Amino acid sequence: MSAATETEVREFQTEVSQLLDLMIHALYSNKEIFLRELISNASDANDKLRFAGLSDDSLFEGDSELTIKLEFDKEAGTFSIMDNGIGMSRDEVISNIGTIAKSGTKEFFKSLTGDQQRDAHLIGQFGVGFYSSFIVADKVTLETRKAGAGAEQGVRWISAGDGSYTLENMEKAERGTRITLHMREDEKEFLDAWRLRSIVRKFSDHVTWPVKMLEELPPAPPAKEGEEPEPPKTPEWETVNKASALWTLSKNDITEDEYKEFYKHVGHDFEDPMEWVHARMEGRMEYTLLLYIPGRAPFDLWDRDRRGGLKLFVRRVFIMDTSEELLPRYLRFVRGVIDSADLPLNVSREILQQNRQVEAIKKGLVHKVLGMLEEMLKNDPEKYATFWKEFGMVLKEGMIEDFANKERIAKLCRFSTTHDGERVPKIALADYVERMKEGQEAIYYVTGESFEACSSSPHLEIFRKKGIEVLLLSDRVDEWTVTHLTEFDGKPLQAITKGELDLSKFAGGEEEAKDEEAEKAQEEALKPITERMAKVLEGQVKEVRLSHRLTESPACLVGDAHDMSATLERLLKEAGQEVPTAKRILEINPSHALLKRLADEADEEKFGELTHVLHDQALLAEGGQLKDPSQFVKRLNKLLMG
């Protein structure tokens, strides 16, 4: 490298500067987490070296005892943490520390609210890691060398967290990373052995690598008269944490607080988990699992490139962060550890995707997670309601992805319905089936782009009048869910916006079932109107017919029984897919005053204007978009002015 590039001053990426500013303010009340974050990073560096060393033991450079060391200097006002892990090259320092090279960054900043407590949670989820140093330090120096690189390839990084950093080459004999924090004047409390030890034991007791500090020696006794004073003893490094893999211990030997703190380490979260399951699986496959459900949904839950939430170990050796290989996507919110006794140490992602043993583990993990949710639902419905609020929309994807567990997942799902009219989904499909009217053969549902669009749909009118419950499905995933969950408990799911509808066998209020002959007579009498309307709307609709589902609205649009729903059509088009626009059926309410006006309208131009407005209103009522809104407004104004 040329001398000109040996030392350089670089600007932080804009997002890093924003994050530093946000973090210092939002996390100040929880500032001791800086040590947990730095220990967690050091632990990851050791994990990576241990894994890389399986295939190239020269990377250990003759020292395979991996540790994390802490030291402080009260006089200098500094705290340092050292690991002898994988280390970083100059380019890696720039990409890992000078920029935020992770997906979901924009979504993260959009999700910040200004509420310190909520933002602290989000910042914690984002993974502040190294940047947490600036909560307590006004200057940070990082010195690192990549394992296997020459001593002259060391790198020094220095910043005061003010928008820029200095990068320079250095000689570094030992591989790994040393981070030195120049503590702020009001943060000198952390330059204390007892304080540091207590934080390590609180947050990092079960980090798998020994966290060491120099032992504290009592002052040497004064020399007796005429005797030489004793030479000062050299303090030894002593391990502060238990350095045991928590998941390998018996459940009876682990406290609730230890489970919670381990989650914060492995899940990179600041908050307690909602629930967890810890089990040792034996038989054909032997593995241990410790799985957690977070307290809140992460901001990047919908990001397909997000980091895996599971850490895979083989006989306590960390292999990789993974997710999809061991859990289906609909359980991507799960965090935790899997430790296999049977997988090879050199396992790769490709092997994971093709390995039968991995399939067996995956099946076992799904069984455990669904079992944990079933237990939560049974024993703590309030907690399950919180789970559903945070992760329900993702769990619904399981009915699409996991055919084997479709029924089991369906029983865990909660829905909004016309029964209580509440936005918060509380109703189970089993509850719906139990309340079905005598003679009701289908589970009825309506889909829409919002709860309001569903609950105010004109298609619901006859169902409300007859007291028949309807599921209100407004989550984006619902359109795909109902194409896969076609029945529940032997009852088919039926969209109320498609196909012919005959609810005449159900009386509603004082209404008696209509005589079939009377209905035919009414259809015949109104045939001239439906034919005139169909002519006006030629090319826009399949047909115009009398409705059996409207009681208040003048018209609605419906599809044939096997047509794609209007909502799904819109979603696919928004996703950039070419979807042929299906012509809908316009159903009109023969009892509505507007239909009587249409019947009396002799002026064909006015009849046409009224028909178009009626059609456009029906389209708007179901959440659709008009091709020509200005034309609709002109027609409406014209009719209003008589």
Swiss-Prot record:
Residues 216-238 are annotated as: Disordered. Residues 350-570 are annotated as: B. Keywords: ATP-binding, Chaperone, Cytoplasm, Nucleotide-binding, Stress response. GO terms for cellular component: cytoplasm. GO terms for molecular function: ATP binding; ATP hydrolysis activity; ATP-dependent protein folding chaperone; unfolded protein binding. It comes from the Bacteria. It holds the Pfam family HSP90. The keyword Chaperone applies. InterPro entries: HATPase_C_sf, Heat_shock_protein_90_CS, HSP90_C, Hsp90_fam, Hsp90_N, Ribosomal_Su5_D2-typ_SF. It is found in: Cytoplasm. Its main location: cytoplasm. Residues 224-236 have a biased composition (Basic and acidic residues). Coiled coil: none annotated. Residues 571-642 are annotated as: C. Residues 1-349 are annotated as: A. Belongs to the heat shock protein 90 family. NCBIfam families: PRK05218.1 (NF003555). PANTHER family: HEAT SHOCK PROTEIN 90 FAMILY MEMBER. Molecular chaperone. Has ATPase activity. Homodimer. This is Chaperone protein HtpG. It comes from Magnetococcus marinus (strain ATCC BAA-1437 / JCM 17883 / MC-1). The gene is htpG.
